[in-house]
Amino acid sequence: MRAGAAMLTAVLLSGVLLCGCGGGSGGGTTPTQTQAAAPIIATTAAQNGAVIVSLASATSGATLYYTVDGSTPGTSSPQYLAPFLVAANLNVKAIATASGDTASSVTSQSFTPNIPSGTLVWSDEFSNSTGANAQPNPLVWTYDTGTDCCGNNELETYCAWGSSASSCNPANPNAYVGTDGYLHIVAQQPTAGTAVYTSARLKTEGLFSFQYGRIEARMMLPESQGMWPAFWLLGNNIATISWPACGELDVLEHINGSNPENEGFDWVQGSVHGTNLNGGIQYHPAAFSAAAWHTYGMIWTKGQIQYYVDNPANVYATYTSSTMAGTWPFDSGPQFVIMNLAVGGSWPGSPDATTVFPSTMLVDYVRVYTN
């Protein structure tokens, strides 16, 4: 039975092949393969000679790869995922690839801003002259939204500006730029006595990112039980390689003063996370209070991360690729900025009867400088 079927199949295939070869005008042709459109490099001005670079291709669905050191990009080069800051002398090269197409030609552009070290090159000063509470700049900030964030057992619902989803109230936003010139990130309890909480988590993902330099934010933090403010960064490539491979840089994390881990003193923490790579060092000088205004910053150079409070010379934590176990992800590409105020979670614990609502995280500015 099987042999007979095989013989019949062979006969049929022979017929197909013979038919396919017959006739001069009836034969098939191999489709001509097209080339993906070369990337377009566009720039917008940042500050003091720095620019924000974005890449695009006219080929629908194209994936873009780029380098900044003048080397020829390939599919193993960093994938372009968001606009990035250029504040140093670089040669950006990019290609586009798309299914069914050959790779594009290389697009190249050199940047020679020659900006001195310590120069302010990007910032959000949260200025507001409208006379009313205003939306955080939508060209800079977007939002994570919803519940059960991040695997931390947090309790809040994160709300975007203008959202009426779930417990969110657009008339009482959780993130706004006040007439006082500060960004307000507000944790609220819409109905007193319930375990329903709202807050905000702002991010520059897809809008702004940078690699290397110094970033700092001047902030005043809430101290109530269950509050968990943070100022941090994640790799642009989180969507393609996930966390923790993308890398996480925690410029600041703080939990309530009553937590047993605090051992009677107030503190903030600067951390790094990657694949099999973790580090966290606390800053707790005498009489330090996170409820007062302080500037929290990070100095990012190749192979090294440093954290400081109030002055770049006041470094309290240093992490290096040469001394840490695991995979160091912080030389692999740009990262985007996040600021949020979590409620509850595995680290701070839940709010209790002493917790003050609303609790507010105030941000005076976020600034990026050259090293």
Task: Enumerate the language-model features and the residues they cover.
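Bacterial N-terminal signal peptides that target proteins for export
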Residues: 1-11
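Short, compositionally stereotyped local motifs that mark structural "simplifiers"
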Residues: 28-116
